[in-house]
Amino acid sequence: MMVNDIEYIRQAEATRVQVLSEALPYIQQFAGRTVVVKYGGAAMKDSHLKDQVIRDIVFLSCVGLRPILVHGGGPEINSWLDKLGIEAQFKNGLRVTDAPTMDVVEMVLVGRVNKEIVSLINQAGGLAVGLCGKDGNLITARPQGQEGIGFVGEVSNVNIKILETLASNGYIPVVSSVAADDSGQAYNINADTVAGEIAAALGAEKLILLTDTRGILKDYQDPGTLIPKVDIREARELINSGVVSGGMIPKVTCCVRSLAQGVRAAHIIDGRIPHALLLEIFTDVGIGTMILGSQYS
């Protein structure tokens, strides 16, 4: 073995030790705490990234955190609508969800995407249980109210009992964003919204949104303008001033709403970065934008 090889091995080992020692205080701090992760975007479509997200979720569970995974599934819904000859329509960024589309949304999110994620977590050594808003009356929906969008819903109520029962016994709840109203009518709800409302109802330590952007950027065209940390007041100002715009507005709004209801910190991170969850939670620097509640110390 060459001297250079030995030095390389030493440096690699030193890096591993540094990473592990840096993670320890965070593992101790967050043990027993609930972390709600919204899973979507490229990290759902790329099989390699998907595998890493799954492993990260299992890691969180193994070191004593209580992860709850909320997922979307837009691309797969579009694929199945296409196979069934149903045209996908959007209005003001929302999927127009008529009765046939709602059937497909529920079939894909609850029957396919959810069960695939559950299976992958279980194969990776976790204990996952798949749910939708209908299970255990977890989420009661109400119409979103906008005209011409069909069965698009909002969260009216969250019943956290089933989540607390599962998480406290070492299970990882995996939640799809389909729920019913009081009459039993199914609704399609934005997965960011569901994650935020679940985090708020549980008083979670963290809400983490996996996205296809680095976080909140001062200039959305320049990844180098990442804002690593803001408080809830500054986040509202960024929306009002137009720095936060387009598709980032509902994500930041969702974070602000959850923080206002008691979540301690919300994170918007780039799910395209390998092991983004672990880097954000267990390292000093983090990789995305952390939005702090006013009570966070």
From Swiss-Prot:
Catalysed transformations (reactions): N-acetyl-L-glutamate + ATP = N-acetyl-L-glutamyl 5-phosphate + ADP
Site (described: Transition state stabilizer): 38, 251
EC number: 2.7.2.8
Residues annotated as binding substrate: 73-74, 95, 188
Principal location listed in the UniProt entry: cytoplasm
InterPro entries: AceGlu_kinase-like_sf, AcgluKinase_fam, ArgB, Asp/Glu/Uridylate_kinase, Glu/AcGlu_kinase, NAGK-C
Record's subcellular location: Cytoplasm
Pathway: Amino-acid biosynthesis; L-arginine biosynthesis; N(2)-acetyl-L-ornithine from L-glutamate: step 2/4
Keywords for this protein: Amino-acid biosynthesis, Arginine biosynthesis, ATP-binding, Cytoplasm, Kinase, Nucleotide-binding, Transferase
SUPFAM superfamilies for the chain: Carbamate kinase-like (SSF53633)
Any GO MF annotation of the entry: ATP binding
CDD domains associated with the record: AAK_NAGK-C (cd04250)
Gene Ontology biological process: arginine biosynthetic process via ornithine; L-arginine biosynthetic process
A Gene Ontology cellular-component term: cytoplasm
Pfam family, one: AA_kinase
Main function: Catalyzes the ATP-dependent phosphorylation of N-acetyl-L-glutamate.
PANTHER family cross-referenced by the UniProt entry: N-ACETYLGLUTAMATE SYNTHASE, N-ACETYLGLUTAMATE SYNTHASE, MITOCHONDRIAL
Record's protein name: Acetylglutamate kinase
UniProt organism field: Nostoc sp. (strain PCC 7120 / SAG 25.82 / UTEX 2576)
Organism taxonomic ancestry: Bacteria, Bacillati, Cyanobacteriota, Cyanophyceae, Nostocales
